[in-house]
């Protein structure tokens, strides 16, 4: 008799052909909802169609189907991203002066867009140097392309075609994994496996392959470029990859191959994996050998991290165990139950991811200027300002999104009957203490931060400069910030003995780096002016958090409306006969939070723009004398509200206001148009629904008189729809106005 060990059961993780592919169904507007699919009775139908198209929760309550829809939509998103990237590379290949810029990046400005001569628009094609006329771009693509070793427009064409292939592949994957082989719910909930694959695969192998590309392709090509070799004379990427002797001429350790690696004599590789710190004086960017070293180190960390979690083999961490063991002395059951929340509520999961990614994006904004990663990025002031502003806005939106989805989780997915005495339950039970304390902090910060400015304006108006808070009168030095700067400046040789220079020139202690007689970076001094505006930052951030957190903690119930959870995520008021209950839904808190996020980020980007023009950016003479763009006026001018209005907003708006008739005139038109878009928003925000309904009814009467009445009954926007349209135009108008103001200014003077 043969005894066989039982065969291990193979888990089937996908359903085959679960949903048929039907273009007839998709062609029907609102096919995802019985009500909407019936077609329009009133004009509200089109708004509901847009509001619910991506609200998968409203299509079905089946978590598996919702998960599959989200998964499939992600592939669609990736497809759009590849298409967009492909377009960027195509513009670089077809409409740009990339090759000219590559040969002289200090005198030629990047341009990848040429305007057609229709109705005189060719005025927008400014002279960017090198005999090329086009629109100056500030996206940083040229700098990324140079850093990655792209030396010709042909290579950009090839990459653009590759992007299109990947876009098609992603579209196919989105269809395939919903209609042909759709993963089961268990697959989406297998977090350990997901962590292992994402950490080791995406982040680990991704970083490793990028490090490999940098070592074998970017470093040698950039070494030639920095030495002034004509891009057409530089060997092509595959020659470096296939011919080791070619690399060994630049980096001698390549001649020894992998021997130093396996004999643990890693120091041999120090010619291309460095730990220098600071900036390359030729390009004003981080040392590319430092960056390659960084990606190799990150890859090792993530490859290890991707083998830490317990899957089919009984070793490693289980997330559920980690969470349930996470108990503090004052937190009751601690994180018990969070595992179930995060594997059954994608809103809860998304909320955490948005909060993390939003914070990370803001961190990226701050590192792009203080540690500029790409060659010739630091001296391209327009790109520096654009990258900072862009990443700040994106980070702000993501963080508000985190609060929005946390509130949706509270309303739709939170089950109070199964949660007792865990962390979330405890936070909810003393939410009054949290919100009232936060409210007190906001009042304190608001009065004190603004009060310092009002004091200065008053003293300035009364002609008493000696009584102002300033670096030359009553000093309020940011001593903690200065201490942090100093600690980092002194780190090489003390806490970071391996590093030659500090992580960033901004800490101080070093000399400035100039490229082509322009300042790339220098130690940034902090004084009373920065102390004042930093407290405005603290104030606006805390108010944003107050509004958003109150929305989350009171999403299900409040003293005013105990049954709020039954009313849903967004509702205008608690029904007729209950006055004073409007604008209390979780959605309304997100709506209000967006305005304060806009306030907060605006002050940050204004601070950055002025500070850099005043104290960092500028030209340097052959004698070594630095002339800053605004001549260091930040310290004395930004300490009054009047100074911000007069010396920043008004003084620096002259370029955009006077741009008519020049190649910057598009920014002048955008400045005007975006102000109009912003003003248009006020019509939605300050006006009641009834006003519009009355107006519509008299317009309908006129149509009836002329027998041209539509079949679909016109309706005013609901209160929530009106506020949504209002906040959208407010933010769009405000951001586009700022964009035009910043770019016209910095392209003209930078």
UniProtKB/Swiss-Prot annotation:
Gene Ontology molecular function terms on file: 4 iron, 4 sulfur cluster binding; chlorophyll binding; electron transfer activity; magnesium ion binding; oxidoreductase activity
Enzyme Commission numbers on file: 1.97.1.12
Residues annotated as transmembrane: 70-93, 156-179, 195-219, 291-309, 346-369, 385-411, 433-455, 531-549, 589-610, 664-686, 724-744
Pfam families in the cross-refs: PsaA_PsaB (PF00223)
Keyword terms: 4Fe-4S, Chlorophyll, Chloroplast, Chromophore, Electron transport, Iron, Iron-sulfur, Magnesium, Membrane, Metal-binding, Oxidoreductase, Photosynthesis, Photosystem I, Plastid, Thylakoid, Transmembrane, Transmembrane helix, Transport
Catalytically driven reaction(s): reduced [plastocyanin] + hnu + oxidized [2Fe-2S]-[ferredoxin] = oxidized [plastocyanin] + reduced [2Fe-2S]-[ferredoxin]
Bilayer topology annotation: Multi-pass membrane protein
Source organism, top-level taxon: Eukaryota
Gene3D superfamilies for the chain: Photosystem I PsaA/PsaB
Cofactor binding annotation: P700 is a chlorophyll a/chlorophyll a' dimer, A0 is one or more chlorophyll a, A1 is one or both phylloquinones and FX is a shared 4Fe-4S iron-sulfur center.
GO BP field: photosynthesis
Residues noted as binding chlorophyll a' in the record, renumbered to the chain: 675
Residue positions binding [4Fe-4S] cluster: 573, 582
Compartment(s) of residence: Plastid, Chloroplast thylakoid membrane
Signal peptide: none
Residues the record lists as binding phylloquinone: 692
GO CC field: chloroplast thylakoid membrane; photosystem I
Binding site for chlorophyll a: 683, 691
Functional note: PsaA and PsaB bind P700, the primary electron donor of photosystem I (PSI), as well as the electron acceptors A0, A1 and FX. PSI is a plastocyanin-ferredoxin oxidoreductase, converting photonic excitation into a charge separation, which transfers an electron from the donor P700 chlorophyll pair to the spectroscopically characterized acceptors A0, A1, FX, FA and FB in turn. Oxidized P700 is reduced on the lumenal side of the thylakoid membrane by plastocyanin.
Family recorded in the similarity comment: Belongs to the PsaA/PsaB family.
Subunit structure as annotated in this protein's UniProt entry: The PsaA/B heterodimer binds the P700 chlorophyll special pair and subsequent electron acceptors. PSI consists of a core antenna complex that captures photons, and an electron transfer chain that converts photonic excitation into a charge separation. The eukaryotic PSI reaction center is composed of at least 11 subunits.
HAMAP family on file: PSI_PsaA
The protein, known as: Photosystem I P700 chlorophyll a apoprotein A1
Organism of this sequence: Lotus japonicus
